[in-house]
């Protein structure tokens, strides 16, 4: 494939990168045009930011123009943002932007296996795992719902990091008393479980998510409300630790001494957590009655859902629309508009089938330019063309009212872009649905449509109509194939790098 590289003209504020000729060589350089994106070394915790002001016109409403404001204000009282691929789509950025127009932002499932990256108005990067992405907006209350599994040391570390950067959490973060506690030992046995699976490993984040949900399902888990009863907490924790030791010989339970130490630790945690603990079911339903606007922030994505994802290479919770009701305790009839977030190409971290995966120069380029390394593990993400079959399947399950197409700017270097539009079986017949059979999925052939690239920097554009014709054709072809309108388009990491269609 013939691709064109960029001439770099930005002044980096924080970066470990250098602009070298390597990128031009890799991309088969044959022309010049300007762009502010840098080729960066693998370091997912560092982001290059330009000190130059954007070329976009100044707009009101915190960077949202009139068209965007109309889109946002039309969203229903209870709306949601969910992943439409395999995670890492950019949900946090959309939630951060929408949160300014909502009273409450709520997490309904998952745990610290989420990694949502957002930026404040000064361009400072925040990586959130448990705290909802609405936290940077002072008027927003952030709810951690009953469906979330909460690792208290991680939560407090996150809160401390926010506080040290001037972001107050006092009175703004509510933790469900029904949420289950994720302990350090859950993380340890998560790793032991992966070691047991050997070559069949799932590729978890080793954050203890699966073991904690397992404790919940077999009904010996410990909930946040149990911290109010430390007289029985010790007995419950002893049962959990004993079960882990019986199941995993390599897990060393130190008996009474270890138990006593852990109980004392959680007594301190309980005292600190108490101001945050709330009956969030009562709180959210009360807010609905008071006509407050609520935005639900999904974590992971549909293709990682425990039921509808590429099982067993999935997460341990319901990351589709149905998880909103079970994870927050609200009725299905109150859930309104859902926005699916779709990256302009496809990525996946960890194991599992990947029909449109790209190997070689193009895949390496997308990984490097897009900083495609897992927010949790730092593992390089696998990259591929946009899989229309999978996206259509996700839209069918969730009933998305609209989509957010993120990272469109990352395709600006490509002279040709492919869309995976059809799955074909080995015998040549068309597969009309996304298969549950992974063996079948690994052997399907993908039929592609090839679209022209636009080979120009779009990161400073702020009106959809100003996009190059080829970029608009790419967006509109996705809409045609999927059958869901794209209302939001991400064209860079910054808060204002958004287009409204």
Swiss-Prot record:
InterPro entries: Adenylosuccin_syn_Lys_AS, Adenylosuccinate_synth_dom1, Adenylosuccinate_synth_dom2, Adenylosuccinate_synth_dom3, Adenylosuccinate_synthetase, P-loop_NTPase
Catalysed reaction, written as an equation: IMP + L-aspartate + GTP = N(6)-(1,2-dicarboxyethyl)-AMP + GDP + phosphate + 2 H(+)
Binding site for IMP: 88-91, 113-116, 205, 219, 300, 315, 379
Residues spanning the signal sequence: none
Cofactor annotation comment: Binds 1 Mg(2+) ion per subunit.
Catalytic center residues: 88, 116
Cofactor: Mg(2+)
Xref: SMART domains: Adenylsucc_synt
EC number(s) reported in the record: 6.3.4.4
Complex and partners: Homodimer.
Protein name: Adenylosuccinate synthetase 2, chloroplastic
Native source species: Capsicum frutescens (Cayenne pepper)
